[in-house]
Swiss-Prot record:
Keyword match Nucleotide-binding: no
PROSITE patterns (alphabetical): ARID (PS51011), REKLES (PS51486)
Protein's name according to its UniProt entry: AT-rich interactive domain-containing protein 3A
Biased composition (Gly residues): 549-576
Region described as Disordered: spans on this chain: 14-222, 497-516, 539-593
Gene: ARID3A
Expression (tissue specificity): Widely expressed, with highest expression in skeletal muscle, thalamus, and colon.
Modified residues (Phosphothreonine): T98
Annotated keywords: Cytoplasm, DNA-binding, Isopeptide bond, Nucleus, Phosphoprotein, Transcription, Transcription regulation, Ubl conjugation
């Protein structure tokens, strides 16, 4: 390879120059005049003739040294020197024609001096250009070393041309002992590098500049644990900050989940103190999730609004580092409510597709289920003078297949029993039992709903299961209530309950067997609804009753407004003029009395 050949040539020249130097140091230098025939010498010889002669006269031994170094610097010198003796012309010509010749290694002392002074500056760039052209053809493994050497060479070239006192045996031969570095460039810059690299210092002026930024932390993520804690404590001068952080870290340590690292967000330490203050001011983590207040929290923390997952990141970091502390100190929520809020937030997009009639669980608004704008209590016409008992239907729950599930919750007994003093106390007991059963069934349904929400089932399946379970519980409670009433009252009760999928209505028919004080009632809750009631009132009149349709004897009749047949009854004239008879009230979706 070319590089190896150049290195071997340089080594040979150094050895020969050293031998010649030892031999010439014993001979005194002759300063004869230069013959005019040496016109083919290097054109740079006439640049400094006076200074060259002065230096040659003063420092003969040092000139010989420079000659050796100059011979290494340009092996292909075109001609001799004016200072050489006349007899050395033939030797120069012979040396120039010899292949593999080391160059000007055997020239006279005068020639050596001029060669050094005149051609060091001119030939050195040529030699470097040749070396750079050779390096371009080398392998990639050697290119890395060459690149480093080129940087060193450029730095050395910035020191200026070699001066008279910059060369010596201590500079030449120590470089000889390092051949792998000697093949780059000529010997002069290598000699300079051996002396001046440790001196002035900037062997790699750009290297220090590149290393310095790496020592500086690029962002807060490279900080150590102690630095992060220090930054967290020193974010502002609020005296409550240190107190809060000490209390937080102590609590987490006692809890068994010590804070081993400080969360980083947007390349800065996440301010746990301000995050806790902002969230608790909004009502706690559950309220922030439900009301979607994360944008305000982000602005309060002075975080960039361009963060795409700011809400998720803040929520997870708060849950990890601050939520246990919030539950312990403030008690704004509990983990079950937090999980329900997270699940609700995830289902929000899909929940809108079910419509507004979809059942939604609300711990504080469970009684809202017991009202229905479709079936007002006044339309049933069952309110009596004493207790105003009524049947309050709950809203229909829409399942996946859009089938309506009627759920009837008896808030009170469906029939006024004020006209039966014998069974009034028993009726009150049955009413209390019915209310307790309804409350218990509602609580059980809500508890099961909470469990369903915390499970991993799809929202549609959860809603269907909740609806089925609540319907089953309510139907069972209704049947038990009516059966208990049948055991106490002299009535015959028939309960028709069909499956919800059949879309048929449930009817409750009560037929009294009490003789003159008989009760005939028919109630149909869902679908087309109607009811007929005819019974005698006590002597005291009530203004809530409808006007009497009969004469002074007080009589009334009820007919089915829906065309399904009616129950008709008459009461005797025991009441006299003061007695009033409650007429039947027919109610339907299409017609009202």
């Amino acid at each position: 390879m070319k590089l190896q050949a150049v290195m071997e040539t340089l080594l040979q020249r150094q050895q020969r120059a050293r031998q010649e130097l030892e031999a010439r140091q014993q001979l005194p230098p002759d300063p004869p005049a230069a013959p005019p025939g040496r016109a083919r010498a290097a054109p740079d010889e006439d640049r400094e003739p006076e200074s060259a002669r002065m230096q040659r006269a003063q420092m003969a031994a040092l000139a010989a040294m420079r000659a050796a170094a100059a011979g290494l610097g340009h092996p292909a010198s075109p001609g001799g020197s004016e200072d050489g003796p006349p007899g050395s012309e033939e030797e120069d010509a012979a040396r120039e024609g010899t292949p593999g010749s080391p160059g000007r290694g055997r020239e006279g002392p005068g020639e050596e001096h001029f060669e050094d002074m005149a051609s060091d500056e001119d030939m050195k760039p040529k030699w470097e250009e040749e070396e750079m052209e050779e390096d371009l053809g080398e392998d990639e493994e050697e290119e890395e070393e060459d690149y480093e050497d080129e940087e060193e060479e450029e730095d050395e070239e910035g020191l200026g041309p070699p001066g008279p006192a910059s060369l010596g045996t201590t500079a030449l031969f120590p470089r000889k002992a390092q051949p792998p570095q000697a093949f780059r460039g000529d010997g002069v810059p290598r000699v300079l590098g051996g002396q001046e690299r440790p001196g002035p210092g900037p062997a790699h002026p750009g290297g220090a500049a590149h290393v310095a930024p790496q020592l500086q932390p690029p962002d807060h993520g490279d900080w150590t644990y102690e630095e992060q804690f220090k930054q967290l404590y020193e974010l502002d001068g609020d005296p409550k900050r240190k107190e809060f952080l000490d209390d937080l870290f102590s609590f987490m340590q006692k809890r068994g989940t010590p804070v081993n690292r400080i969360p980083i967000m947007a390349k800065q330490v996440l301010d746990l103190f301000m995050l806790y203050v902002l969230v608790t001011e909004k009502g706690g983590l559950v309220e922030v999730i439900n009301k979607k207040l994360w944008r305000e929290i982000t602005k309060g923390l002075n975080l960039p609004t361009s963060i795409t997952s700011a809400a998720f990141t803040l929520r997870t970091q708060y849950m990890k580092y601050l939520y246990p502390y919030e539950c312990e100190k403030r008690g704004l929520s509990n983990p079950n409510e937090l999980q329900a809020a997270i699940d609700s937030n995830r289902r929000e997009g899909r929940r809108q597709s079910f419509g507004g009639s979809l059942f939604a669980y609300s711990p504080g608004g469970a009684h809202g289920m017991l009202s229905s704008p479709k079936l007002p209590v006044s339309s049933l016409g069952l309110a009596a003078s004493t207790n105003g008992s009524s049947i309050t239907p709950a809203p229909k729950i829409k399942k996946e297949e859009d089938s309506a599930i009627p759920i009837t919750v008896p808030g009170r007994l469906p029939v006024s029993l004020a006209g039966h003093p014998v069974v009034a106390a028993q009726a009150a007991a049955v009413q209390a039992a019915a209310a307790q059963a309804a409350v218990a069934a509602q609580a059980a349904a809500l508890e099961q709903l909470r469990e369903k929400l915390e499970s991993a089932e799809p929202p549609e399946k959860k809603m269907a299961l909740v609806a089925d379970e609540q319907q089953r519980l309510m139907q069972r409670a209704l049947q038990q209530n009516f059966l208990a009433m049948a055991a106490q009252l002299p009535m015959s009760i028939r309960i028709n309950s069909q499956a919800s999928e059949s879309r048929q209505d449930s009817a409750v028919n009560l037929t009294g067997t009490n003789g003159s004080n008989s009760i005939s009632m028919s109630v149909e809750i869902n679908g087309i609804m109607y009811t007929g009631v005819l019974f005698a009132q006590p002597p005291a009149p009530t203004p809530t009753s409808a006007p009497n349709k009969g004469g002074g004897g007080g009589g009334g009749s009820s007919s089915n407004a829906g065309g399904r047949g009616g129950n008709t009854g008459t009461s005797g004239g025991q009441a006299g003029p003061a007695g009033l008879s409650t007429p039947s009230t027919s109610t339907s979706n299409n017609s009202l009395p």
